[in-house]
Curated annotation (Swiss-Prot):
Keyword Cell membrane: yes
Source species: Buchnera aphidicola subsp. Schizaphis graminum (strain Sg)
Gene name of the record: fliF
Descriptive protein name: Flagellar M-ring protein
A Pfam family that the UniProt record links to this protein: YscJ_FliF_C
Stretch forming the signal peptide: none
Length: 556
């Protein structure tokens, strides 16, 4: 590379830089904007470097504690940051432990008092004071325990202990009210509320769950111990819908693998009994089975008449009157009766000659046990009284691709599958109805149209939201363009005008040289030369005028 080319490139760069500086120095607006931007960037960088690292001082501060701590921080001239969503108070990292020690000495922030209040034993405290301290300690400990739940921000508990009474009729149970401050956009589900109820009831003696009331910071009752009629009806309706949807899903799950997706539609109606019903039944039936008969009691009586004289043997002398409670006693007694009968017969045979006119009567009374059954039945709430299912099945396609109805045998199979899926019971009076019809084809396109409409509405909403931003950006770009490029356009016009004048002068010089060459050239034909000069003068009279001026200056 030659030194001349290097010098030319350096000179061109110098010219560009000089033009750039001249452009910015001539345009004062650009200088002001650049100066303001430079000041803002330097200030922001310096503040960012000087800003200390912040660390959490306290979490979940109440409004009263937060105001008290912030006032003390302002008096101590310590910077802080307060997060309203999380309730965190941030202070510089190097002053966290110092501030915690300072606030702990001043007993701030205020925390719930627990069993540590009982550590300070005081002389002369009355029994009422001890009871109040115990109640405060129990309330504080329960509040701390409930605050361990992730959803709960803080808790406040009030316990009402009744006065002790000597009479059982006047004895009352304690009651508890709880207010929970939950975190933002979070809530307690039914299982968590039940857990809190059982936790409190098991922590306090003789406290039942019915005597506990839990509300949140918005005054909403969380435990449904005293539901209204409307709420109970809503729960019943919700339970019925859940049961019906469960049976619908069973029908779809068993038929869609056979008939295809979206070829089966089912509706199930469930009649549910929400009444609480209890029944106690006692039955007595005679025991007709001879082998399994159980004797409850038995009585035997024998009358003997000799020589027209009636003699009634006492049960204690000859025929004992016995009540039997078991089969063992019965067998022993029957054996003794057989002996007595044999002795009577022997005596009759021996005395037959002496006592020709004799008579014997024997009465035997037996009481048997009856079959006795006692049953207690409690009907569950929410028992299904009756189910009715309606199923629509689409036509199937044959080998040629045409929609063909299903035959009767397949419909019977589908009906049997539906019955088995819902647990069909003839005793309850359940009913199942299956229809085979062709589905309406435009329903397939309707979801797409709805999707398109939703997409269009979303597009219009986004377009309307971002249109003001686009307009403002375009307006700002227009102002910047007008500010920056107006002066550059003027400079470009001036530069082009200068270049044009220089080109005109060069053209004039070249033409003058050509004329001088024509003038000093030796030609044989002067008429031709004069004719050419006349043509040049007609075309460019300025050149002739400049030549004449040059001649006059040369003469001088």
């Amino acid at each position: 590379m030659n030194f001349s080319t290097i010098e030319e490139s350096v000179s061109e760069e110098k010219k560009k830089f000089n033009n750039f500086l001249s452009y910015f120095f001539k345009n004062s607006r650009v200088l002001i904007i650049l100066f303001v931007l430079a000041v803002i960037t330097t200030v922001s960088i310096s503040m960012w470097r000087k800003s200390p690292d912040y660390q959490v001082l306290y979490n979940n501060l109440s409004n009263e504690d937060g105001e008290m701590i912030i006032d003390q921080l302002n008096q101590m001239q310590i910077p802080y940051k307060l997060s309203e969503d999380s309730g965190q108070l941030l202070v510089p990292k190097d002053k966290v432990y110092e501030l915690r020690l300072h606030f702990s000495e001043n007993n701030s922030p205020h925390r719930d008092i627990g069993y540590e209040i009982l550590d300070k034993e005081r002389f002369g405290v009355s029994q009422f004071g001890e009871q109040i301290n115990y109640q405060r300690a129990l309330e504080g400990e329960l509040a701390r325990t409930i605050e361990k739940i992730n959803v709960v921000k803080n808790a406040k508990i009030h316990i009402a202990f009744p006065k002790n009474s000597l009479f059982l009729e006047d004895k009352k149970k304690p009651s508890v009210s709880v207010i929970l401050n939950l975190k933002s956009n979070q809530g307690l589900d039914h299982s968590q509320v039940n857990a809190i109820l059982h936790l409190i009831s098991s922590s306090i003696c003789d406290l039942s769950i019915e005597n506990i009331t839990i509300i949140d910071q918005f005054g909403k009752l969380l435990n449904n111990s005293s539901l209204g009629l409307n709420q109970i009806d809503d729960l019943k309706l919700r339970y019925s819908e859940e049961v019906e949807s469960r049976y619908r899903n069973r029908i779809k799950n068993i038929l869609e693998p056979l008939l295809g997706f979206n070829n089966v539609y089912a509706q199930v109606t469930a009649q549910i009994n929400f009444n609480s019903h209890e029944k106690t039944q006692e039955k007595y039936t005679p025991n007709t089975n001879y082998k399994n008969q159980a004797i409850r009691s038995r009585q035997s009586t024998v009358n003997d008449k000799i020589n027209n004289r009636k003699e009634e043997n006492k049960p204690d002398e000859l025929f004992p009157q016995t009540s039997f409670s078991s089969n063992k006693d019965l067998n022993s007694t029957t054996y003794s009766n057989k002996k007595i009968k044999k002795s009577i017969i022997q005596n009759n045979q021996d005395n037959n000659i002496l006592h020709s006119n004799s008579a014997i009567s024997h009465d035997d009374t037996i009481n048997y046990e009856l079959n006795h059954s006692l049953s207690h039945t409690k009907m569950n709430i929410g028992e299904i009284k009756r189910l009715s299912a309606a199923v629509i099945v689409n036509f199937v396609k044959d080998k040629n691709g045409k929609s063909v109805p299903i035959n009767v045998e397949q419909i019977k199979k589908i009906k049997n599958l539906v019955r088995e899926a819902i647990g069909y019971s003839k005793v309850r009076g359940d009913s199942v109805y299956v229809v085979n019809e062709s589905f309406f084809q435009k329903n397939k396109n309707s979801p797409i149209k709805l999707l398109k409409d939703s997409n269009q509405s979303n597009f219009y909403s986004t377009f309307l939201t971002f249109t003001p931003w686009f307009i403002s950006l375009f307006f700002l770009f227009f102002l910047v363009k007008k500010c920056f490029f107006s002066s550059s356009k003027n400079n470009i016009n001036n530069q082009s005008y200068k270049n044009k004048t220089e080109e005109d002068l060069l053209e004039k010089d070249t033409k003058a040289e050509n004329i001088s060459e024509l003038k000093f050239s030796k030609t044989s034909n002067t008429d031709k030369l004069i004719h050419q000069i006349c043509n040049i003068s007609n075309q460019n009279p300025r050149i002739i005028a400049s030549i004449i001026r040059q001649w006059m200056s040369d003469k001088k």
